Amino acid sequence: MIKVIASDMDGTLLGNDHKVAPETLKAIHEACDAGIRFMIATGRNFKGAMEELKETDIVCDYIVGSGAEVRDQKQQIVSTAPLSMELCEEIYENLKEFPVSIIFSSGDYDYRIGTKKEIEESFLKQIQLFHMDTGQDTDESAVLSSPLYRRIVENTKIISEFQELEESQVSVYKVFLYSNDLEMLEKIS
């Protein structure tokens, strides 16, 4: 007997339009009505996951931040596994000389270190790299006017140096970096 259904969000629960299809929502409700527990398992932080689900009536458990935070059906934190600030600093110090975007993810916000202009450029690159289909208009004005761009901006705290992250005493659950320079990324790993 099935007791739990866990679903990823991007490309699984959410379609290309970043919405839950009506037939998927119906299936989730039918499973829950049959006594099967439903949960979201995603690399997103909790706030980012909730942003995508706000127009649904899904009540579920959450495994977010690639497993670093677990929340119950009432959205209360059940457990966390944050990275130590020392490890975050070591990662940052080892990567800061490379031309990559480094994102420190917490339960509520993503923290990016740099100037406002640098970070806004990184938003643009992120969307063009990961979120735009090859058939979509990927020019700067199309990206800047997209709802996805607005969500990324709203879910990001821009800080000028690592010390600000340390002083914020936020729990970092995941460090994410990206670049379209695959050769350089290979050197880092």
Where are these regions (language model features)?
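Short, Lys/Arg-enriched, disordered terminal segments
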Residues: M1-K3, D33
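Asp-based phosphoryl-transfer active-site loop
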Residues: K3-H18, I91
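Conserved acidic, metal-coordinating active-site core of Asp-based
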Residues: F98-V100, S106-S189
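Active-site phosphate-binding/coordination module
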Residues: P22-D139
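Small/polar loops that bind or transfer phosphate-bearing groups
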Residues: N16, I40-A41, L177
